[in-house]
Regions:
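Extracellular/periplasm-exposed beta-strand and loop segments of Gram-negative cell-envelope proteins
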Residues: 36-59, 84-113, 121, 141-168, ...
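Outer-membrane beta-barrel "beta-signal"
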Residues: 26-28, 32, 118, 225-239
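Hydrophobic, lipid-facing positions within transmembrane beta-strands of outer-membrane proteins
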Residues: 25, 62-66, 111-115, 139, ...
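Residue-level signature of outer-membrane beta-barrel architecture
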Residues: 20, 70, 82, 119-121, ...
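Transmembrane beta-barrel strands of outer-membrane/channel proteins
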Residues: 29-35, 80-84, 135-141, 177, ...
Length: 239
């Protein structure tokens, strides 16, 4: 999705430039490392029985995005950002009977759209290079996909549970620095905390090893919240 959006935006920029004045606008492709935080102790329900699932983080993944923004004043700017996170994995186990010791694994992927606002502080110079610190945040919507969930009991009975995708309210807080490279191009380095909302499994499952059968859960497996700390690097080009 991000690649298609990036290509579409780049192809339409010349046309947009003819139609409107691009002064004050900027574009920022970016990428970075996404380190997840604990999702929280959650409760599973399979056919009427509830049990605790151990607190778990989703490991470390990657994040890529593209922002298009506009300087409203010399210090305040707004932007629309599309981003995608991958490489995260739900990997935990049940912490209570009757499924004590059963492991649960699933790949996690998220796509999000944010509206961000940033305040740029006064610039200062280091070795003839202009540096501009900033802080801000954003709100948006994320599409959180939990892939096929594989559960393995201590007796090696393996069950696959359908994946699911949820739309969730998301928010972020960020602080960073713009390092001027040319009059129009700046290196954008920032740290951000992002809460992407909840993720859950589907309801249908099938036993794939150590037994036979299929059924439907009375309640989806609740994985908890996707919360990440991210270090991002981008290139801001001002028109």
């Amino acid at each position: 999705m991000i690649r298609k959006l990036t290509l579409a935006l780049l192809l339409t920029l010349p046309t947009i430039g003819v139609a409107i004045d691009l002064e004050g606008f900027y574009i920022t492709p970016k990428g970075g490392i996404s380190k997840s935080m604990d999702t929280g102790v959650t409760v599973g329900d399979t056919g009427g029985g509830q049990f605790d699932i151990k607190d778990n983080d989703l490991g470390t993944g990657s994040v890529f995005g593209l922002s298009i923004g506009k300087y409203i004043t010399n210090n305040f700017r707004l932007e629309l950002e599309a981003s995608q996170r991958g490489g995260l994995e739900y990997d935990t186990e049940y912490a209570s009977e009757p499924n004590l010791g059963t492991t649960t694994k699933a790949d996690i992927d998220t796509k999000s759209i944010f509206i961000n606002g940033f305040y740029d502080f006064e610039s200062f110079t280091i070795s003839s290079t202009s540096v501009t610190p900033y802080f801000g945040g954003g709100v948006g919507i994320s599409r959180n996909k939990m892939g096929t969930t594989t559960e393995t009991t201590p007796d090696q009975v393996i069950t696959d549970l359908d994946g699911n995708t949820l739309s969730q309210f998301s928010y972020k807080l960020a602080a960073g620095t713009l390092v001027s490279l040319t009059e129009s191009l700046s290196l954008d380095i920032n740290y951000q905390y992002v809460n992407l909302g909840n993720f859950k499994s589907g309801l249908d499952y099938v036993v794939v090893s150590g037994g036979a059968g299929s059924d439907t859960l009375t309640e989806a497996l609740n994985g908890g919240e996707i919360k990440t700390q991210e270090l991002m690097v981008g290139l801001q080009y001002k028109f």
